Protein backbone atom coordinates (compact mmCIF):
# COMPACT_ATOMS: atom_id res chain seq x y z
CA UNK A 1 0.00 0.00 0.00
CA UNK A 2 1.45 3.34 -1.04
CA UNK A 3 1.54 6.06 1.60
CA UNK A 4 1.77 9.56 0.15
CA UNK A 5 1.33 12.85 2.07
CA UNK A 6 0.26 10.90 5.16
CA UNK A 7 -2.58 9.12 3.34
CA UNK A 8 -2.75 5.38 2.63
CA UNK A 9 -3.79 5.07 -1.00
CA UNK A 10 -6.21 2.23 -1.84
CA UNK A 11 -4.48 -0.75 -3.45
CA UNK A 12 -6.70 -1.86 -6.30
CA UNK A 13 -7.60 1.52 -7.77
CA UNK A 14 -5.96 3.31 -10.67
CA UNK A 15 -3.30 5.80 -9.59
CA UNK A 16 -5.33 8.82 -10.74
CA UNK A 17 -8.32 7.76 -8.65
CA UNK A 18 -6.16 6.81 -5.66
CA UNK A 19 -4.45 10.22 -5.63
CA UNK A 20 -7.85 11.92 -5.24
CA UNK A 21 -8.03 10.39 -1.73
CA UNK A 22 -5.51 13.07 -0.73
CA UNK A 23 -7.23 16.27 0.44
CA UNK A 24 -6.55 19.01 -2.08
CA UNK A 25 -5.98 16.77 -5.10
CA UNK A 26 -8.81 16.33 -7.58
CA UNK A 27 -8.85 14.38 -10.81
CA UNK A 28 -7.26 17.08 -13.02
CA UNK A 29 -4.43 17.62 -10.54
CA UNK A 30 -3.94 13.86 -10.18
CA UNK A 31 -3.62 13.50 -13.96
CA UNK A 32 -1.08 16.34 -14.06
CA UNK A 33 0.94 14.72 -11.24
CA UNK A 34 1.01 11.38 -13.10
CA UNK A 35 2.07 13.10 -16.32
CA UNK A 36 4.84 15.09 -14.59
CA UNK A 37 6.07 11.96 -12.78
CA UNK A 38 6.05 9.97 -16.02
CA UNK A 39 3.65 7.34 -14.68
CA UNK A 40 0.78 5.87 -16.70
CA UNK A 41 -2.68 6.82 -15.44
CA UNK A 42 -3.94 3.27 -16.03
CA UNK A 43 -1.52 1.51 -13.67
CA UNK A 44 -2.93 0.25 -10.37
CA UNK A 45 -1.57 1.45 -7.04
CA UNK A 46 -0.40 -2.02 -5.98
CA UNK A 47 1.62 -2.31 -9.22
CA UNK A 48 3.70 0.80 -8.47
CA UNK A 49 7.41 0.21 -7.95
CA UNK A 50 9.14 1.93 -5.00
CA UNK A 51 10.78 4.30 -7.52
CA UNK A 52 7.35 5.23 -8.93
CA UNK A 53 6.05 5.85 -5.42
CA UNK A 54 9.00 8.14 -4.72
CA UNK A 55 8.36 10.05 -7.95
CA UNK A 56 4.72 10.54 -6.95
CA UNK A 57 5.74 11.67 -3.46
CA UNK A 58 8.12 14.28 -4.87
CA UNK A 59 5.42 15.56 -7.28
CA UNK A 60 2.75 15.73 -4.55
CA UNK A 61 5.17 17.63 -2.29
CA UNK A 62 5.07 20.49 -4.81
CA UNK A 63 1.39 21.07 -3.98
CA UNK A 64 -0.24 22.33 -0.81
CA UNK A 65 -2.25 19.34 0.42
CA UNK A 66 -3.71 17.74 3.55
CA UNK A 67 -2.85 19.51 6.83
CA UNK A 68 -1.23 22.58 5.28
CA UNK A 69 -4.22 23.20 3.00
CA UNK A 70 -6.75 22.59 5.79
CA UNK A 71 -4.84 25.02 8.02
CA UNK A 72 -4.72 27.66 5.29
CA UNK A 73 -8.48 27.38 4.63
CA UNK A 74 -9.34 27.64 8.33
CA UNK A 75 -7.03 30.64 8.75
CA UNK A 76 -8.67 32.35 5.76
CA UNK A 77 -12.11 31.84 7.32
CA UNK A 78 -10.83 33.03 10.70
CA UNK A 79 -9.40 36.17 9.07
CA UNK A 80 -12.75 36.93 7.38
CA UNK A 81 -14.53 36.58 10.73
CA UNK A 82 -12.00 38.81 12.54
CA UNK A 83 -12.15 41.67 10.04
CA UNK A 84 -15.95 41.58 10.17
CA UNK A 85 -16.54 41.25 6.44
CA UNK A 86 -19.93 40.17 5.12
CA UNK A 87 -18.59 36.68 4.42
CA UNK A 88 -17.10 36.52 7.92
CA UNK A 89 -20.43 37.45 9.49
CA UNK A 90 -22.17 34.75 7.45
CA UNK A 91 -19.59 32.21 8.66
CA UNK A 92 -20.07 33.33 12.27
CA UNK A 93 -23.86 33.03 12.04
CA UNK A 94 -23.71 29.67 10.28
CA UNK A 95 -25.53 30.91 7.17
CA UNK A 96 -24.71 30.37 3.48
CA UNK A 97 -21.71 32.45 2.49
CA UNK A 98 -21.95 32.55 -1.29
CA UNK A 99 -25.20 34.42 -1.87
CA UNK A 100 -27.72 31.57 -1.81
CA UNK A 101 -31.33 32.30 -0.90
CA UNK A 102 -32.31 31.55 2.69
CA UNK A 103 -36.06 32.20 2.70
CA UNK A 104 -37.02 28.55 2.22
CA UNK A 105 -33.80 26.62 1.74
CA UNK A 106 -30.32 26.37 3.33
CA UNK A 107 -31.46 23.87 5.98
CA UNK A 108 -28.07 22.13 5.99
CA UNK A 109 -26.28 25.34 6.88
CA UNK A 110 -28.94 26.87 9.15
CA UNK A 111 -29.75 23.70 11.09
CA UNK A 112 -33.12 22.09 11.70
CA UNK A 113 -36.26 24.20 11.91
CA UNK A 114 -37.47 24.76 15.47
CA UNK A 115 -41.19 24.38 16.06
Curated annotation (Swiss-Prot):
GO biological process per UniProt: translation
Annotated region (Disordered), positions in chain: 92-115
Entry keywords, A to Z: Ribonucleoprotein, Ribosomal protein, RNA-binding, rRNA-binding, tRNA-binding
Entry GO MF terms: rRNA binding; structural constituent of ribosome; tRNA binding
Keyword Ribonucleoprotein: yes
Top-level taxon of the source organism: Bacteria
Basic residues: compositionally biased ranges: 106-115
Family annotation (InterPro entries): Rbsml_uS13_C (IPR027437), Ribosomal_uS13 (IPR001892), Ribosomal_uS13-like_H2TH (IPR010979), Ribosomal_uS13_bac-type (IPR019980), Ribosomal_uS13_CS (IPR018269)
GO cellular component terms, A-Z: cytosol; small ribosomal subunit
Matches recorded under NCBIfam families: uS13_bact (TIGR03631)
Record note on quaternary structure: Part of the 30S ribosomal subunit. Forms a loose heterodimer with protein S19. Forms two bridges to the 50S subunit in the 70S ribosome.
Family of the protein in this entry: Belongs to the universal ribosomal protein uS13 family.
Function according to Swiss-Prot or TrEMBL: Located at the top of the head of the 30S subunit, it contacts several helices of the 16S rRNA. In the 70S ribosome it contacts the 23S rRNA (bridge B1a) and protein L5 of the 50S subunit (bridge B1b), connecting the 2 subunits; these bridges are implicated in subunit movement. Contacts the tRNAs in the A and P-sites.
Name the UniProt record assigns to this protein: Small ribosomal subunit protein uS13
Organism of origin: Lactobacillus gasseri (strain ATCC 33323 / DSM 20243 / BCRC 14619 / CIP 102991 / JCM 1131 / KCTC 3163 / NCIMB 11718 / NCTC 13722 / AM63)
Lineage: Bacteria, Bacillati, Bacillota, Bacilli, Lactobacillales
Gene name for this UniProt entry: rpsM
Amino acid sequence: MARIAGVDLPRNKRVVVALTYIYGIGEPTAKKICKDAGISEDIRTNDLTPEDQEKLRSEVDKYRVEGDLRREVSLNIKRLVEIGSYRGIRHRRGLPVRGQNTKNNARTRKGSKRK
